[in-house]
């Protein structure tokens, strides 16, 4: 029985599910599902539609099931510069604000104000 591995790549304009397995000592990759993505304006902020992304991730996994190719593991890669704040019950607080939102202007310069020593002092447990 084949062992399948699912990689989900979520980019700024689209996402895709790539299913891989080994065949005759070589890795075989197959695109299973593709979906659109993009920032939206919501409450005056540029945000990601987290609900739509979650549904797209599930839809691609369901496609694997339809094909009878159930992955033994799943990895998800994103642009990795955005965040969502959670409350004490792990519920979202507000929108998933995108890195291109106006609130991030000048942040790279602000980050340079902290030397590695100062950052260590701030983050040390």
What are these regions (language model features)?
Residues 1-95:
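N-terminal glycine/serine-rich phosphate-binding loop of ATP-dependent small-molecule kinases
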Residues 12, 104, 120:
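Short, glycine/acidic-enriched loop or turn micro-motifs at the edges of active sites
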Residues 95, 107, 125:
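Residues that scaffold the ATP/ADP-binding catalytic core of kinase and kinase-like folds
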Residues 101:
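Carbohydrate-associated surface elements
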């Amino acid at each position: 029985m084949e062992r399948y591995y699912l990689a989900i790549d979520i980019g700024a304009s689209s996402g895709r599910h790539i299913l891989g397995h080994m065949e005759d000592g070589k890795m075989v990759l197959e695109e299973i599902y593709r979906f659109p993505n993009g920032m939206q304006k919501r409450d005056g902020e540029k945000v990601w539609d987290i609900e739509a992304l979650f549904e797209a991730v599930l839809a691609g996994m369901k496609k694997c099931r339809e094909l009878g190719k159930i992955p033994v593991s799943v990895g998800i890669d994103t642009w990795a510069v955005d965040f969502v704040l959670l409350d004490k019950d792990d519920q979202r607080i507000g929108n998933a604000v995108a890195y291109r939102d106006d609130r991030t202007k000048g942040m790279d310069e602000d980050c340079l104000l902290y030397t590695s020593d100062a950052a260590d002092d701030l983050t040390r447990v």
